[in-house]
């Protein structure tokens, strides 16, 4: 199974590829990086993940890239790790919330649903890249 994550300072959005369908999963709410890396490690183990797709912004965001790479090194995972450009994934995910009212949009941002929808966009990009290369 393949899992994607959108690593943020407060939340980690999670999406999985199940039988060819990309689904958002419950986001990991970060209290600190050790707790968050432990929670992600547990999820990877529970779901028997073989490939972890991680969103990273373009090179002009050096601090963010370094923070994401450091966090991923804390994760206990022996499978394949693939970094995919995440530019605009949160904006694209937010556009999928147009049907929600203002209050529900705010809740979707706070509870991590937006982050997991962003992880779905990252996983879509990974799938497109894999298909293009085959």
UniProtKB/Swiss-Prot annotation:
It is an enzyme of class 3 (hydrolase). GO terms for molecular function: nuclease activity. Its main location: cytoplasm. Its EC number is 3.1.-.-. GO terms for cellular component: cytosol. One of its GO terms (biological process) is rRNA 5'-end processing. It is found in: Cytoplasm. Keywords: Cytoplasm, Hydrolase, Nuclease, Ribosome biogenesis. It comes from the Bacteria. Belongs to the YqgF nuclease family. NCBIfam families: PRK00109.2-2 (NF001026), RNAse_H_YqgF (TIGR00250). This is Putative pre-16S rRNA nuclease.
């Amino acid at each position: 199974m393949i899992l994607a994550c959108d690593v943020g300072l407060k939340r980690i959005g999670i999406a999985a590829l199940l039988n060819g369908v990309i689904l958002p999963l419950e986001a990991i709410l970060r209290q600190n990086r050790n707790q968050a890396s432990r929670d992600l490690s547990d999820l990877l183990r529970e779901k028997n993940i073989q490939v972890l797709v991680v969103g990273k912004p373009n090179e002009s965001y050096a601090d963010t890239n370094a923070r994401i790479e450091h966090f991923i090194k804390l994760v206990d995972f022996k499978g394949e790790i693939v970094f995919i450009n995440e530019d605009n994934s949160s904006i694209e995910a937010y556009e999928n919330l147009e049907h929600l009212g203002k209050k529900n949009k705010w809740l979707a941002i706070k509870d991590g649903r937006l982050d997991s929808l962003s992880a779905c966009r990252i996983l879509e990009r990974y799938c497109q890249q894999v298909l293009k290369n085959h």
